[in-house]
């Protein structure tokens, strides 16, 4: 649960069929192999096996949002100690953050959503609201340094974006520092529900005030995004207006903030974290908890109209309460960024005690859909809860860059010029270049033993969002290098290629998977082409929980799935030795 957000993990039964595997091997397969196949198919893979990246899945994409919510309220993610303003306490608190950021960077994270406005309180010196107590231990008291500026600098050093996470409607306990100062200044703006205070979503001044807060952040800090949280009606609010009017009220607040932010820095990414199910789907109910109808969050419409550049839906669900709704977010993304929030905290035995493969399979599917992913929250990831951090490091073996916001600007910056390369006696290599518009550009650096360096291959990325026009690299042998300029919208120039380097050209890997879901029209599934290195003769269709639905010969271009119930499935190959490989994911959907 994030900031009082209600997550409703539910289970769903799936249909059961009994496939006739014997017919597939009636003359060529031994009983021993059959037993192995049946054991693998019906029992499923072990958690360890399911958490392993398959050799037959696509390589890590170059463009992908890999985000994490870093929570400051109560210091539950950070900080773990208080700063009284002394050099020692400041350094200790800052070291805690840099340790977390180092861990996140090593796991492939490229976007940090840092809780900046907590409960009408902030982690920076604001002219409008008091300091939050998470830093000093006392609300209203400075920790002796600007925590937001420090976090921005440290994220940017590591090539990561920092988005200021702004909690909008909730303002804390009725007697808390943030709520009390707002009540005194704007008595008609704050409503009490139980022991808590909330900004009135039906008061036009709410949007104006929150726009002022976000403008203060954007004007004073080099944030890469403004991330709105709880931009909705509270679930405990008795909505007396029509749902249509309720959606207009919330949209007016979101629009006011977005317009203000873009008027100051149009490249700052606007995003929010809607409820994980946009609305009821044709075949899948939201079970009474969705964004659009229940709390008047018209998030998909915000993407369409440009109010938002990105969505981070809180999809803290599993099974059929996750997969169909993930597809819905993808289908209604309008070419914008969607990076669903994962219930990583549910791996904890005191939360949902989910097995690891629930989250890892969701990550595989999101990547197949071309979506990003966001861990809720940082501590559960970096604590390696049930091995999720170990998995994330394998899953994100290569760096990724955030997709460009081409709907805002699609003009490519000019490529860097005057490439210089110097190899030191230590083996280190210093690269330098020039750029005409250096004050407004960042740089990506690539290396490969093949010339020209392929900048579309994520395996060649060695640094992203580099801020200077020079970099020194550790000795790793002889390579060719390339440098690109990147503007604040994420548009990347053509590469400036080095002319020095050595090494043999490497061949491409033989892969099966596509860049998205396997094609399926609800009746016919397109099988991926079988490479020469794969000796499998059978494919199995399984639920995401590993339950076997049917087995089919691995031959031809198509498989008949007309008798498979609608739902989300994985396709696996099985060879005569009972060894399985995941080939991809697909959805059976009939209209």
Predicted regions and their residues:
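Beta-strand-rich modules
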Residues: 473-491
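Catalytic domains of carbohydrate-active enzymes, especially glycoside hydrolases
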Residues: 95-121
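Pro/Thr/Ser/Gly-rich low-complexity, intrinsically disordered linker/stalk tracts
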Residues: 397-437, 492-505
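Residue-level detector of functionally pivotal "anchor" positions at catalytic/ligand-binding pockets or at interdomain
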Residues: 408-416, 499-522, 588-591
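Active-site-adjacent "subsite" loops/lids of carbohydrate-active enzymes
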Residues: 63, 71-92, 164-216
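Aromatic-lined carbohydrate-recognition surfaces of secreted/lumenal glycan-active proteins
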Residues: 161-173, 227, 248-291, 338-341, ...
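C-terminal tail/sorting-segment detector
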Residues: 505-512, 526, 566-591
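Substrate-binding cleft of secreted/luminal carbohydrate-active enzymes
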Residues: 299, 309-320, 339-407
């Amino acid at each position: 649960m994030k900031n009082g957000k209600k997550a409703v993990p539910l289970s769903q039964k799936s249909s059961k069929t009994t496939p006739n595997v014997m017919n597939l091997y009636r003359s060529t397969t031994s009983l021993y192999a059959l037993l192995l196949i049946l054991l693998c198919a019906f029992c499923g893979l072990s958690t360890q096996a399911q958490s392993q990246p398959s050799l037959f899945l696509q390589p890590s994409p170059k463009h992908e949002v890999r985000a994490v919510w870093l929570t400051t309220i109560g210091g539950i993610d950070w900080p773990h100690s208080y700063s009284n303003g002394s050099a020692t306490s400041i350094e200790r608190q800052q070291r805690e953050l840099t340790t977390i950021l180092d861990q996140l960077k090593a796991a492939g994270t490229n976007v940090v959503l840092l809780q900046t406005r907590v409960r009408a309180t902030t982690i920076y010196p604001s002219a409008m609201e008091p300091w939050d107590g998470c830093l000093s231990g006392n609300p209203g008291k400075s920790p002796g340094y600007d925590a937001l500026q420090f976090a921005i600098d440290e994220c940017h050093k590591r090539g990561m974006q920092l988005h200021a996470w702004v909690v909008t409607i909730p303002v804390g306990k009725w007697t808390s520092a943030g709520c009390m100062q707002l009540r005194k200044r704007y008595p008609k703006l704050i409503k009490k529900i139980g022991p808590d205070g909330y900004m009135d979503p039906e008061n036009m001044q709410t949007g104006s005030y929150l726009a002022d807060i976000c403008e203060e952040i954007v004007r004073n800090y080099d944030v890469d995004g403004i991330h709105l949280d709880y931009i909705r009606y509270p679930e405990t609010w008795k909505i007396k207006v029509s749902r249509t009017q309720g959606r207009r009220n919330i949209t007016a607040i979101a629009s006011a903030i977005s317009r203000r932010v873009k008027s100051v820095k149009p490249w700052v990414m606007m995003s929010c974290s809607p409820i994980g199910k946009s609305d009821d789907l044709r075949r899948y109910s939201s079970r009474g908890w969705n964004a659009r109808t229940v709390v008047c969050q018209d998030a998909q419409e915000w993407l369409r109209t440009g109010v938002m550049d990105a969505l981070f839906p809180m999809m803290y669900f599993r099974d059929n309460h996750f997969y169909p709704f993930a597809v819905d977010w993808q289908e209604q993304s309008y070419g914008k960024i969607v990076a669903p929030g994962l219930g990583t905290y549910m791996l904890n035995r005191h939360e949902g005690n989910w097995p690891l493969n629930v989250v890892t399979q969701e990550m595989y599917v999101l990547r197949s859909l071309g979506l990003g992913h966001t861990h809720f929250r940082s501590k559960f990831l970096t604590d390696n809860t049930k091995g999720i951090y170990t998995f994330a490091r394998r899953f994100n073996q290569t760096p990724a860059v955030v997709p460009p916001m081409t709907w805002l600007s699609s003009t490519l910056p000019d490529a860097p010029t005057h490439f210089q390369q110097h190899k030191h006696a230590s083996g280190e290599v210093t690269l330098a270049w020039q750029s005409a518009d250096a004050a407004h550009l960042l740089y990506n650096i690539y290396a490969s033993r093949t010339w020209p360096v392929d900048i579309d291959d994520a395996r060649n990325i060695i640094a992203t969002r580099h801020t200077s026009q020079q970099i020194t690299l550790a000795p790793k042998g002889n390579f060719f290098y390339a440098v690109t300029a990147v503007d604040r919208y994420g548009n990347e120039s053509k590469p400036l290629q080095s002319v020095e380097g050595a090494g043999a050209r490497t061949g491409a890997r033989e892969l099966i998977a596509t860049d998205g879901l396997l094609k399926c029209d609800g009746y016919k599934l397109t099988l991926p082409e079988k490479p020469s290195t794969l000796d499998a003769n059978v494919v199995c269709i399984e639920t995401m929980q590993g339950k076997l639905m049917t087995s089919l010969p691995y031959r031809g271009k198509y498989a008949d799935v007309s008798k498979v119930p609608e739902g989300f499935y994985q396709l696996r190959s099985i060879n005569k030795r009972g060894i399985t490989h995941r080939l991809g994911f697909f959805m059976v959907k009939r209209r």
